[in-house]
Design a protein with these regions (language model features):
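Extended alpha-helical targeting/anchoring segments
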Residues: 1-346
Length: 346
């Protein structure tokens, strides 16, 4: 039922101090959304979902809850105003993972976010920003060693926990399998939706979104950025503004609506003790695996044509667009420079 077995785990003990154990169950009656609603507990949980839609289908979706450790940084936060990645690295350095067959490369670890404000830790020339008026931390990372993994190719669910090998292995294995069985039990129960999540996933309200800038203030920022570009001080600027909109919709209903209208390979819902982050992306910003760093930026889109001839025409339009070509060159240049700062050739 559990893989690897207790005897197999004991035989691996000399290779590290942490080994995953998992149990597979059928996924034909479950979706990542329903599974998340069944298993999420407490103030922290997440759903990282690859949604089937359009022409793309990511292989895995991940659900985590009940983290064993949480890092929060920023002004007034428990972790203080420090480089959050050093705290993440300190926690990860405690473990020497022993890989096992049958699992994706991610089956536990740190899940969270870095706010734009954290740029000051990585680029010392950038001054520190004032504390966020919304009270949102600069970073939050939850550390999970037990989670649910959907395999959309094999149509199964793997419920994973981890055995700590530093102490009594029998007790650690029993605790890991107990956590697995608890999640399997939750998944097997009927879905009991609270009232705020019943009905269609709609978030429409009569209130318009408001920005933290007036139009004139924002236009002045744009003009200043253009001056910097002409002066050769910058090659790329992202002008940001915060839009706010009141709604009575539950945050997970917002996620469900986004999931419906914009299904993407990388969708995420993070519940972080008092606030939530909802989003979707079609590209891998950065990935590191086996010591290889990669980035896959995407720029330039056109709608699909109704015929192959229309598709060909739209493709040619993209390839011949001076603006799109310039953006691609810029993205390749930026990606090469950023990866080059933390990598070696060969």
């Amino acid at each position: 039922m559990y893989q690897p077995s207790l005897e197999e785990v004991k035989s691996l003990a000399g290779q590290g101090n942490l080994v995953p154990v998992y149990r597979s169950i059928n996924a034909d009656l479950e979706t990542p959304v329903s599974a998340y609603l069944k298993v999420a507990r407490g103030p922290y949980s997440f759903l990282l979902e690859s949604v089937s839609g359009g022409e793309r289908l990511g292989r895995y979706s991940f659900i985590g809850t009940d983290p064993y450790h949480v890092v929060k940084t920023g002004p007034g936060q428990p972790g203080g105003q420090v480089d959050p990645l050093t705290l993440v690295q300190d926690e990860m350095d405690k473990y020497r993972l022993i890989p096992v067959d049958g699992l994706p490369r991610f089956h536990g670890g740190a899940v969270g976010y870095l706010a734009y404000d954290t740029i000051s830790y990585f680029e010392p020339r950038v001054p520190f920003m004032p504390a966020d008026p919304q009270g949102v931390p600069e970073s939050v990372f939850t550390f999970v060693d037990t989670l649910v993994i959907f395999d959309h190719i094999r149509h199964d669910i793997k419920v994973v926990s981890h055995v700590h090998l530093d102490g009594d292995i029998d007790k650690a294995y029993a605790e890991a399998t107990r956590k697995i069985d608890d999640l399997v039990k939750r998944l097997g129960q009927p879905l009991d939706l609270p009232p705020e999540l019943q009905g269609p996933a709609t978030v429409s309200t009569p209130v318009e979104a408001t920005s933290n800038f007036t139009k004139d203030e924002y236009n002045k920022i744009v003009e200043k950025c253009i001056e910097y570009i002409y002066a050769g001080d910058v090659i790329q600027v992202v002008n940001s503004q915060r839009f706010s909109r009141k709604t009575e919709a539950h945050p997970f209903q917002v996620y469900r609506s986004l999931r419906s209208i914009n299904p993407s390979p990388y969708m995420y819902y993070l519940d972080l003790d008092g606030f939530q982050i909802v989003g979707a992306a079609i590209e891998t910003v950065v990935q590191v695996q086996d010591g290889i760093a990669a980035t896959h930026p995407i720029a330039g889109t056109r709608p699909r044509g109704k015929t192959p001839a229309e598709d060909d025409a739209l493709e040619a339009e993209l390839k011949n667009s001076e603006k799109q070509r310039a953006e691609h060159i810029m993205l390749v240049d930026l990606g090469r420079n950023d990866i080059g700062r933390v990598s070696v050739t060969g």
